[in-house]
Design a protein with these regions (language model features):
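FIC/Doc superfamily catalytic core
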Residues: 1-282
Length: 282
């Protein structure tokens, strides 16, 4: 909830979001506080949603935008676009086309849900939904919630995976993938982007499970915390991130145990002391 709202520029902190959800008094924009209440109420309905029902989509949008917009729970009746200052960089389809386009999208999902993999189908829906921009407000929040709804109907574990948090982390890439798809006229780049995010999420979950199962040392945990996925690091750059000066301490306590547990791999495994050696977090 916090991450999905942050993507939409809600300024409340994580602690403030928690306080709102727990019914505590929070000093802040009433609109932003209402957004938190609405998003929490919408996500509470996740297990009741039929992701292939347009009626349910409008129902959840009504919850997500309650007390915030006049057209809550209804498709927009006005025209919408994305602007960079005074320049329109994307114009959504005309309002008169929304019912037809949304029916086509939901019909396509129903027809293909048993033949197209849910990870791909949900990403296609996410992009097409953002492109159609069916509501006057809340389209981004609804797209991300519905993405989760489709996947959690397939595998309930997806209702617990931090999809929105991952998108927030790679927010620039998220919007770039959408913009590139607008130009290309297809959703392939967005599908690839989302699959990469799920791959990262599952890697992180795997590490967390290993951490609890194998009692990873605090040294290795610190090492993994400072390393990003798929980024090749030199030993010196990692030592700088860890604020270490002793190469022996670094090897003995941090890097060697991580390599032994297959949490970090070497780019030149047959020559551990190579000057070209780099380390990549798995």
């Amino acid at each position: 909830i916090y991450s999905s709202l942050r993507i939409e520029a809600n300024a409340l902190s994580l602690n403030e979001v928690r306080d709102v959800i727990n019914g505590h008094v929070v000093l802040g924009s009433q609109k932003e506080i209402q957004e938190v209440k609405n998003a929490y109420a919408a996500y509470e309905k996740l297990d009741q949603i039929d992701p292939y029902s347009m009626k349910d989509l409008k129902w959840i949008h009504g919850i997500m935008t309650s007390f915030l917009v006049q057209e809550s729970g209804e498709f927009r009746r006005g025209e919408e676009g994305v602007f960079d200052g005074d320049e329109c960089i994307f114009m959504a389809p005309p309002a008169r086309m929304i019912p037809h386009l949304m029916k086509e999208l939901f019909d396509w999902m129903k027809e293909n849900k048993d033949t197209i993999h849910p990870l791909i189908l949900s990403a296609v829906f996410h992009y097409e939904f953002v492109f159609i921009h069916p509501f006057s407000d809340g389209n981004g929040r609804m797209a991300r919630l519905w993405h989760t709804a489709i996947l959690s109907k397939w595998k309930p574990v997806f209702s617990y995976l931090p999809v929105e948090s991952q998108i927030e982390k790679f927010q620039e890439g998220y919007y770039k993938a959408i913009a590139d798809c607008h130009i290309a006229g297809e959703s392939n780049l967005f599908i690839e982007f989302m699959l990469e995010q799920f791959d990262r999420i599952l890697d992180e979950v795997t590490v967390q499970l290993r951490s609890s199962d194998e009692n990873i040392s605090e040294y290795v945990k610190r090492l993994l915390d400072v390393m990003e996925y798929d980024v090749p690091y030199t030993a010196k750059s990692i030592m700088d991130l860890l604020q270490l000066k002793s190469r022996e301490t670094f090897r003995k306590n941090y890097m060697n145990p991580a390599i032994e547990m297959n949490l970090v791999v070497m780019t030149v495994p047959d020559k551990p002391q190579s000057r070209n050696q780099r380390y990549i977090k798995k």
